[in-house]
Swiss-Prot record:
CDD domains to which the protein is assigned, alphabetical: SGNH_plant_lipase_like
One GO process term, biological-process aspect: lipid catabolic process
Tree of life domain: Eukaryota
MF terms (GO), sorted A to Z: hydrolase activity, acting on ester bonds
Similarity-based family: Belongs to the 'GDSL' lipolytic enzyme family.
Record: active site: S41 (nucleophile), D344, H347
Glycosylation sites: N137, N319
Name of protein: GDSL esterase/lipase At1g28570
Signal peptide stretch: 1-25
One Pfam family per UniProt: Lipase_GDSL
Residues passing through the membrane, by range: none
Length: 389
């Protein structure tokens, strides 16, 4: 153990010397070599499934999860591909494999540490405040530690690792949503939950700063979904007071304001980091508005006129029931998931994720926008057809 520890210490000391190299601060076209991903179920491509007790598997271990594209469960929290999958395809990469439990996986073009149920803050910190959750103990800090410990296996030398990190698109989430979800679901009031926001933002910022110190150059940092449009929250906070609902979307206005509160603070912190590290590209992914537009104009995007009910759940006005246990009760699903925005009441369908990814990659929901002008014509041709497949 001591020998391994000293090897890791030596590795990072050498790596840090390479990270002192001056980087051109001029904006450059984004031509990535790989994807490094952290986050929760929005980006999890199989990590929670790999970490789970075989006698108590999560719902993503079973159909109908994965039915649309893969035709079998993969550990993804959807009927098909996720935003991270569409990003990988857009860049001409294979789908990013999960890190945990992967045997003989090829991480040359990407590695994913995102885990379903993960939080930004440490589990012990949340539990001290009465916020309990059963799913995972893999916080953002744990994911980052796993990444650092894996570097000697992902690259052959400190200079090679620096090159890999510098030329990767680093996807920082979405992360933090579960910190709020768990707090809401145990009955914390809005003011108590607002107190978590600066702590979540600080945790995300610290992780970005640490990765910058390791050579990270381009970060895609998503904001929160509009919680007031979430089927889970619409079911939990259902009310007869029509004034609480947005008349256009049917979303709960006060919950969407909370999401906006988080996103405003996150963007302010990202702006601070960008000024502090002008040689780094920090891109904000506006998950809030790219998803909200699907509720505002569902027909425009091919969805049913009432887009909020879940495709695949267990009844109720929004086809969703809180508290369903792992692996229990196979839900009844809609005939055509491509017509629905919400998959299971918490996560989106592949159709919704495709449109969200397109809004981030092609605009206008990435701030600042990506510059893809230097990509090869082969990849550009793939991009032109990707979103229609």
């Amino acid at each position: 153990m001591a020998t391994l520890f000293m090897k890791l210490v030596s590795f990072f000391l050498i790596l840090s010397t390479f990270c002192l190299t001056t980087v051109n601060s001029e904006p450059q076209c984004h031509n990535f070599k790989s994807i490094i991903s952290f986050g929760d179920s929005i980006a999890d491509t199989g990590n929670l499934l790999a970490l789970s007790d075989p006698t108590n598997l999560p719902k993503v271990a079973f159909l109908p999860y994965g039915e649309t594209f893969f035709h079998h469960p993969t550990g993804r929290f959807s009927n098909g591909r996720l935003i991270i999958d569409f990003i990988a395809e857009f860049l001409g990469f294979p789908l990013v494999p999960p890190f945990y439990g992967s045997q003989n996986a090829n991480f040359e073009k990407g590695v994913n540490f995102a885990v379903g149920g993960a939080t930004a803050l440490e589990r012990s910190f949340l539990e001290e405040r009465g916020i309990h959750f059963p799913y995972t103990n893999v916080s953002l800090a744990v994911q980052l530690s796993s990444f650092k410990e894996s570097l000697p296996n992902l690259c052959v030398s400190p200079s090679d690792c620096r090159d890999m990190i510098e030329n990767s698109l680093i996807l920082m989430g979405e992360i933090g949503g579960n910190d709020y979800n768990y707090a809401f679901f145990v009955g914390k009031n809005i003011e108590e939950i607002k107190e978590l926001v600066p702590l979540v933002i600080e945790t995300i910022s610290s992780a970005i700063t640490e990765l910058i110190g390791m050579g990270g150059k381009t970060f895609l940092v998503p904001g929160e979904f509009p919680l007031g449009c979430s089927v889970a929250y619409l079911s939990l906070y259902q009310t007869s007071n029509i004034e609480e609902y947005d008349p256009l979307t049917g979303c709960l206005k006060w919950l969407n304001k909370f999401s906006e509160y988080h996103d405003e603070q996150l963007q302010a912190e990202l702006n601070r980091l960008q000024k502090l590290y002008p040689h780094v590209n920090i891109i904000y992914a506006d998950y809030y508005n790219t998803l909200l537009r699907l509720a505002q104009e569902p027909a425009k995007f091919g969805f049913i006129s009432r887009p909020l009910p879940a495709c695949c759940a267990l009844g109720g006005p929004f086809n969703f029931t809180l508290g369903r246990k792992r692996g229990t009760q196979v839900p009844e699903c809609c005939d055509d998931p491509s017509k629905y925005v919400s998959w299971d009441g918490v996560h989106m369908t592949e159709a919704a994720y495709r449109l969200m990814a397109e809004g981030i990659l092609k605009g206008p929901y990435a701030i600042p926008p990506f510059d893809w002008s230097c990509l090869s014509s082969e990849i550009k041709n793939t991009q032109n057809s990707l979103m229609n497949n």
